[in-house]
């Protein structure tokens, strides 16, 4: 019971959430014998922060400095804030502080793309949560299921664990993570609570903050560089329920009104294939089309067919195969649409020699079809970090074209350029949680129905 409401759980979700709560209570303790920082200790920490700022050329505001203090004081810290509020700068400062203390740090994120961005932003190796927990594949012949090697019996050997993009983490993955964290380890969870919740069950980050049990630092100041981006400014306007700013003078946020769906198709293809690669120096595969819906004239299914025919048309020597309702072609941009803990991947050198291997391809991983073998009936897909997976034809039911994807599937990703085609039919989907944080340019194509008003974009 929740007041007058009755809440129903699947058993597995309920017990996973209960287990997480119990483990969090056990982990949530002050890291200081005295319980609080003494004035001299706080002064010493802030002095060290000042040194880091000077060395790294940073300028932290009071909330960012508070986040560093809380990370020293507590075993669990939640760091949240919208785009442009300095989460990455704060993470970098925390890393440099604990590094200076001689502590071992692990950095992780839910997806390969997010982990790669974290590595680039911090200069410190970040891994996917699955890889950090050492996912091992299933062995059907022995009845062994896929599992994590790191758990309560074999915890992570880290003094500090920082997990980014926590809004993407579902309750089951969070439970597996907590099992591998031993008491005395600092756990710092970072994310934007205003982003969409995870695709899997639970809204872990939002629930942790709402519990008011754990220390939370919410960054609010939009820094100067971010203030110059209309994307960031409009993201915060939408979160506040305010009208977005539309101006032809913007460097990164554009609203293009077109009067019919065919015209939108034509203009999108021109943008992706010709105009944007020149303007933002991005290949067509760096440009992502996002849409709120799967069905309809501007839904994922229709748009993928339109964009595939224009951006990766058939040609002599380019193999293709029809599997179910989808035509796959060498060179296609694709996405894995469900977690598969058994799929094996490998990274090969330029000479074709395997240099790394592992298991597991996960919901939202995006790649390129490199080869279709009609004789063996297999499809070779290359994912981030040059991971190559060979799918059998039946396994390709877990893969779909990704020239256009749903906004929900884009969660936690960043792209150089995004195009969002919209109809007023999607009005019910235009909530503030559907705005994404994008790395560079943002284009919005919208077909206005009679009697509609531009304020509807709010």
Q: How should each PLM-predicted stretch be described?
A:
Residues 1-44:
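Interdomain "pre-motor" coupling segment immediately N-terminal to P-loop NTPase/helicase cores
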Residues 56, 170, 305-435, 439, ...:
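Conserved nucleotide-binding/hydrolysis modules and their immediate coupling elements
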Residues 57-73:
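N-terminal pre-P-loop "Q-motif" helix
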Residues 79, 107:
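Hydrophobic anchor at the beta1->P-loop junction of P-loop NTPases
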Residues 87:
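Conserved lysine of the Walker
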Residues 93, 97, 101-103, 109-117, ...:
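Conserved helicase motor core of SF1/SF2 NTP-dependent helicases
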Residues 139-157:
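Conserved alpha-helical scaffold flanking the Walker A/P-loop in AAA+ ATPase domains
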Residues 193-359:
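Conserved helicase motor core of P-loop NTPases
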């Amino acid at each position: 019971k929740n007041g007058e409401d009755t809440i129903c759980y699947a058993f597995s979700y309920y017990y996973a959430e209960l287990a997480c709560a119990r483990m969090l209570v056990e982990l949530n303790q002050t890291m200081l014998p005295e319980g609080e920082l003494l004035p001299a200790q706080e002064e010493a920490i802030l002095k060290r922060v000042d040194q880091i700022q000077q060395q790294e050329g940073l300028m932290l505001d009071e909330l960012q400095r508070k986040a560093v203090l809380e990370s020293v004081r507590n075993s669990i810290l939640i760091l949240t804030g919208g785009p442009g509020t300095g989460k990455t700068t704060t993470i970098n400062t925390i890393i440099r502080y604990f590094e200076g203390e001689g502590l071992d740090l692990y950095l992780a994120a839910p997806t390969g793309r997010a982990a790669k961005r974290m590595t680039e932003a911090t200069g410190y190796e970040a891994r996917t949560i699955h890889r950090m927990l050492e996912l091992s594949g299933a062995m059907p012949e022995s009845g062994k299921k896929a599992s994590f090697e790191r758990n309560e019996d074999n915890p992570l050997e880290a003094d500090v664990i920082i997990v980014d993009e926590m809004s993407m983490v579902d309750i089951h993955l969070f439970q597996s993570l907590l099992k591998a964290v031993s008491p005395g380890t600092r756990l710092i969870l970072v994310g934007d609570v205003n982003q969409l919740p995870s695709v899997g069950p639970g809204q872990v980050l939002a629930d942790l903050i709402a519990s008011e049990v754990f220390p939370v630092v919410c960054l609010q100041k939009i820094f100067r560089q971010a203030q110059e981006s209309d994307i960031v400014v409009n993201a915060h306007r939408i979160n506040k329920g305010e009208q977005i700013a539309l101006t032809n003078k913007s460097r990164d946020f554009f609203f293009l009104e077109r009067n019919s769906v065919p015209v939108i198709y034509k203009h999108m293809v021109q943008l992706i294939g010709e105009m944007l690669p020149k303007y933002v120096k991005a290949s067509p595969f760096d440009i992502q089309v996002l849409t709120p819906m799967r069905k309809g004239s501007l839904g994922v299914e229709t748009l993928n067919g339109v964009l595939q025919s224009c951006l990766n048309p058939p040609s002599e020597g380019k193999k293709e195969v029809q599997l179910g309702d989808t035509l796959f072609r060498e060179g296609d941009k694709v996405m894995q649409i469900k977690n598969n803990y058994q799929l094996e991947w490998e990274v090969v050198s330029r000479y074709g020699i395997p240099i790394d291997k592992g298991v597991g391809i996960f919901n939202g991983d995006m790649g390129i079809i490199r080869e279709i073998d009609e004789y063996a009936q297999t499809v070779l897909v290359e994912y981030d970090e040059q991971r190559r997976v060979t799918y059998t034809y039946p396994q390709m039911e877990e893969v779909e074209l990704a020239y256009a994807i749903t906004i929900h599937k884009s969660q936690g990703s960043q792209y150089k350029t995004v195009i969002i085609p919209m109809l007023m039919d999607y009005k019910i989907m235009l909530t503030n949680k559907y705005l994404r944080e994008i790395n560079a340019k943002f284009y919005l194509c919208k077909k206005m129905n009679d009697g509609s008003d531009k304020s509807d974009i709010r």
